[in-house]
Amino acid sequence: MKKTKVVCVGEALIDRIRNKSNEGFTDFLGGAPANVACALSKLKIDSTFIGRLGSDDYGKKFITQFNKLDVNLDFLQVNNDSSTRVVNVDRDKFGDRFFSGFELSLIHI
């Protein structure tokens, strides 16, 4: 039987989620492609992540997590001149999520 291999391309970013008390935030490793690569690896499916991280502490945390889960990083780019993207996640009065922090995203392209 052939082993399944999946390539996940896109963002790895920090989800900065507002605490329920509305006082402060908690940071989580996020970004759908990064999350999928990690989840597949936990399911024993070979996964590769292709994306770009900053060389900051958040970027290092991603690399540590990817390595811990044996996600292939052969095509990962690490940018020494920028930081890993952080996105703020808030909830409106109905509990729906909304995101901010993409305003400067073109700087990272």
Label the model's feature ranges.
Residues M1-N19:
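Positively charged, low-complexity intrinsically disordered leader regions
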Residues L29-V36, Y58:
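Conserved donor sugar-nucleotide recognition element shared by glycan-biosynthetic enzymes
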